[in-house]
């Protein structure tokens, strides 16, 4: 419905499909596919050669990004803080030409300081409460406490701040969570943009809904909003959130 790359199987074991075993295809929610495509296609100014997935594990979005980067002649750095999850990312990228993607194990919060202004595109698929996937994982509600939102929101701010420092002027950062909670979504985006503006790093929020409409066979229900929120009951996806910011100074 909303991912131009999706194939819906009504039954069977996906693991028996050769393309999935070879990592040429993967099992992923359509919402996750769409936000990764938005990250790959959002309009930027200037070169489009260096891409970064700041929180790449377990690798579904990274694989899609890497394939898109290879098609465009760009290179993807897939960063993941967990060694185990970094291994999953390497497995997910097996079908991508090795010179087009590289996996690194490190803390994404450090990249903005260590490599300022290096990247043209950055995806921040931030750790979150996962409240947007309750339709598939209803038991997750019992593993979360109200205080988790506050803790994760601070981490999300740090990661988005790092991403905006790592992207060059004219480049774009796509911020994604699998949560509809405002404390993890729009408030993070606006707070970070406001804080960095005080330090002289300016951004503009691009219209993620317009990018989604251009890509999706059927526009998402919330495509009229500049920050895109998907919904299970309207879009048939997890409740993914997506915002696109372009660095202007």
Regions found by a protein language model. Give the residues of each.
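S-adenosylmethionine
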Residues: 1-249
